[in-house]
């Protein structure tokens, strides 16, 4: 593996972690939102970033990329709120399946992964610069 592959690998990780933070931020921002479709209000469904290995060479060395962003298949929550305009005949309303705690933790984890990969890039750059000064 070339030392320069580290730039490609960490670069792909930076891009992917940035996209993950974006997905989690959108989930948090829309946790109380509804989508109006065909005359009906539907609760926002949490999105889950799906990552995929992104090979650089045939040596199973590579980075990561965002494969897709899928809707969370866990069921929507029902809350009793008979005064809500979207309540059913029993007084229950469907609300988003966004788990605030999990989304916050996932956003922090993506942020830390981003910082770690940035540090890897800086360390690699410093190693290359030190190598260039050998023999001077």
Curated annotation (Swiss-Prot):
UniProt keyword list: Bacterial flagellum
Biological processes annotated in GO: bacterial-type flagellum-dependent swarming motility
Presence of the UniProt keyword Nucleotide-binding in the record: no
Intrachain S-S bonds: none
CC per GO annotation: bacterial-type flagellum basal body, rod
Subcellular location(s) of the protein: Bacterial flagellum basal body
Subunit structure, interactors included: The basal body constitutes a major portion of the flagellar organelle and consists of four rings (L,P,S, and M) mounted on a central rod. The rod consists of about 26 subunits of FlgG in the distal portion, and FlgB, FlgC and FlgF are thought to build up the proximal portion of the rod with about 6 subunits each.
NCBIfam families per the UniProt record, alphabetical: FlgC (TIGR01395)
Protein name (Swiss-Prot/TrEMBL): Flagellar basal-body rod protein FlgC
Species per Swiss-Prot/TrEMBL record: Buchnera aphidicola subsp. Baizongia pistaciae (strain Bp)
């Amino acid at each position: 593996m070339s030392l320069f592959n580290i730039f490609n690998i960490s670069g792909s990780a930076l891009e992917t972690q940035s996209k993950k933070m974006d997905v989690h931020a959108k989930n948090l921002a829309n946790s109380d939102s509804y989508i109006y479709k065909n005359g009906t209000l539907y609760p926002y469904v949490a999105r889950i970033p799906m990552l995929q290995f992104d090979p650089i060479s045939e040596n199973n060395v590579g980075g990561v990329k965002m494969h897709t962003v899928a809707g969370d298949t866990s069921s929507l929550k029902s809350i009793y709120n008979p005064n809500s305009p979207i309540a059913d005949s029993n007084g229950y309303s469907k609300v988003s399946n966004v788990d605030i705690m999990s989304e916050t933790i996932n956003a922090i984890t993506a942020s830390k992964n981003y910082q770690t990969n940035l540090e890897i890039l800086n360390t690699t750059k410093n190693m290359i610069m030190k190598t260039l000064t050998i023999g001077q």
